Amino acid sequence: MNTEIPWQTAKQYEDITYKKCNGVARIAFNRPEVRNAFRPRTTSELIDALRDATEDTSIGCVLISAEGPSPKDGVWSFCSGGDQRVRGKQGYVGDDGAHRLNILEAQRLIRFMPKVVIAVV
């Protein structure tokens, strides 16, 4: 019996993967080389994917997971938090030059999403 899920890429990103299949959206952190630590780009992409999943009437459930394992040591990590290597003295700076990490907006979207959200850790 084939248990492979036929995920289809919903949108291309650099720091996350975003796929859909049969009413389920899968958003995964995709920076295993840094234990899936997030940076401003990661949160911007996460917010964009969460908004898309919210607006897509064919989606009833959103899975949040992570890619891996780390190419350094083979260890799997869901997310290690903010990437301290890109954090400056003034905090995180987004691609637009604004000082922020904007993770609170991602948390708000998850909390108030009118669909089931599951962290696959």
Name what the model sees in each region.
Residues P114-V121:
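A short, small-residue-rich loop immediately preceding and capping a beta-strand
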Residues M1-P69:
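Conserved CoA-thioester-binding segment of acyl-CoA-metabolizing enzymes
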